[in-house]
């Protein structure tokens, strides 16, 4: 069901009023274009992947990084304009990382009148106890965080957990799976958790990381560093990021092309027998039926 207005309506709305969070943002043409583009792409992902059911409550994960701040701001802007008929609850999970500035997020959320929940769970100690010194903590830390966020979503009556992954996150995951996992899989824009009671949504799936960086700078979000624990993301993801940046530099626009390709698959032109019945082609040949598939 189409729950959101068309793009023309959205673009007209983007020129009008907005959430108080945007009260002191730049009035430049450049920023207005950036905001409009991010709103349009966020709305497009929400519509394309049927994320909205009226009356829902969404738990918006807020880490303090540029992506989650941008996600929250764009969703609040859409809701302020009457374009997102859901209730939003921001949530930060303080995982006990060393030197985590506990005051920044509550101060920011309270100052802007944003409904939120802050919860402390010392997953940092769990990770450091389980993994040898020098290991990359990000994967285990993320899994533990996700489990707590699912629990909080249930406790708060939220049917969806909303995450700030963007276009580059999806492409990097695709190539990590391709090169290191031997499978064609990316990061889904919409996923039901294993228990079947919380939907995971990624409304920024079409948004470019560089746009979110510019947006965060213009909005003056109080960014919290993601490396407080001293660990860095694995070399595999960093290598994929560097590869994609090199491709984009040499052939501008390829990232957008790759994202479009992920929604334009041809199972008959791959090698997965679970997706396409190659054996049925023998019967088709005998009966003379047309089984062509855009060769």
UniProtKB/Swiss-Prot annotation:
Coiled-coil residue spans: none
GO molecular function: 4 iron, 4 sulfur cluster binding; ATP binding; magnesium ion binding; sulfurtransferase activity; tRNA binding
Residue positions of motif PP-loop motif: 63-68
Subcellular location: Cytoplasm
Reactions catalysed, as given in the entry: cytidine(32) in tRNA + S-sulfanyl-L-cysteinyl-[cysteine desulfurase] + AH2 + ATP = 2-thiocytidine(32) in tRNA + L-cysteinyl-[cysteine desulfurase] + A + AMP + diphosphate + H(+)
Cofactor notes: Binds 1 [4Fe-4S] cluster per subunit. The cluster is chelated by three Cys residues, the fourth Fe has a free coordination site that may bind a sulfur atom transferred from the persulfide of IscS.
Cofactors named for this entry: Mg(2+); [4Fe-4S] cluster
Keyword Zinc-finger among record annotations: no
One cellular-component annotation, GO: cytoplasm
Keywords: 4Fe-4S, ATP-binding, Cytoplasm, Iron, Iron-sulfur, Magnesium, Metal-binding, Nucleotide-binding, RNA-binding, Transferase, tRNA processing, tRNA-binding
EC number: 2.8.1.-
InterPro entries noted in UniProt: Rossmann-like_a/b/a_fold, TilS/TtcA_N, tRNA_Cyd_32_2_STrfase, tRNA_thiolation_TtcA_Ctu1
Protein origin, superkingdom: Bacteria
One Pfam family this sequence matches: ATP_bind_3
Role according to the record: Catalyzes the ATP-dependent 2-thiolation of cytidine in position 32 of tRNA, to form 2-thiocytidine (s(2)C32). The sulfur atoms are provided by the cysteine/cysteine desulfurase (IscS) system.
Extra remark beyond the main annotation: The thiolation reaction likely consists of two steps: a first activation step by ATP to form an adenylated intermediate of the target base of tRNA, and a second nucleophilic substitution step of the sulfur (S) atom supplied by the hydrosulfide attached to the Fe-S cluster.
Quaternary structure (record): Homodimer.
Sequence similarity: Belongs to the TtcA family.
Name of the molecule in the record: tRNA-cytidine(32) 2-sulfurtransferase
Taxonomic source organism: Mesorhizobium japonicum (strain LMG 29417 / CECT 9101 / MAFF 303099) (Mesorhizobium loti (strain MAFF 303099))
């Amino acid at each position: 069901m189409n729950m959101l207005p068309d793009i023309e309506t959205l673009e007209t709305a983007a020129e009008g009023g907005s959430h108080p969070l945007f009260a002191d943002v730049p009035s430049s043409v450049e920023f207005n274009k950036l905001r409009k583009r991010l709103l349009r792409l966020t709305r497009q992902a929400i519509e394309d992947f049927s994320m909205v059911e009226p009356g829902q409550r969404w738990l918006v994960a807020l880490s303090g990084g540029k992506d989650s701040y941008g996600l929250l701001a764009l969703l609040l802007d859409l809701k302020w304009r009457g374009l997102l008929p859901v209730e939003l609850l921001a949530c930060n999970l303080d995982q006990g990382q060393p030197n985590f500035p506990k005051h920044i997020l509550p101060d920011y959320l309270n100052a802007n009148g944003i409904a939120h929940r802050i919860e402390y769970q010392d997953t940092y100690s769990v990770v450091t106890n389980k993994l040898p010194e020098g290991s990359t903590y990000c994967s285990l830390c993320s899994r533990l965080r996700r489990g707590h966020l699912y629990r909080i979503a249930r406790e708060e009556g939220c049917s969806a957990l909303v995450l700030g992954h963007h276009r580059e996150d999806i492409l990097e995951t695709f190539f990590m799976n391709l090169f290191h996992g031997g499978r064609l899989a990316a990061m889904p824009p919409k996923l039901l958790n294993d228990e079947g009671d919380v939907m995971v949504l990624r409304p920024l799936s079409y948004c470019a990381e560089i746009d979110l960086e510019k947006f965060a700078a213009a909005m003056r979000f109080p960014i919290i560093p993601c490396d407080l624990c001293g660990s860095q993301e694995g070399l595999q993801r960093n290598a994929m990021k560097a590869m994609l940046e090199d491709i984009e530099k040499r052939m501008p626009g390829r990232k957008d092309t790759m994202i479009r390709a992920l929604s334009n698959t041809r199972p008959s032109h791959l090698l997965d027998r679970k997706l396409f019945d190659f054996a049925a082609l023998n019967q088709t040949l005998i009966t003379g039926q047309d089984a062509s598939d855009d060769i």
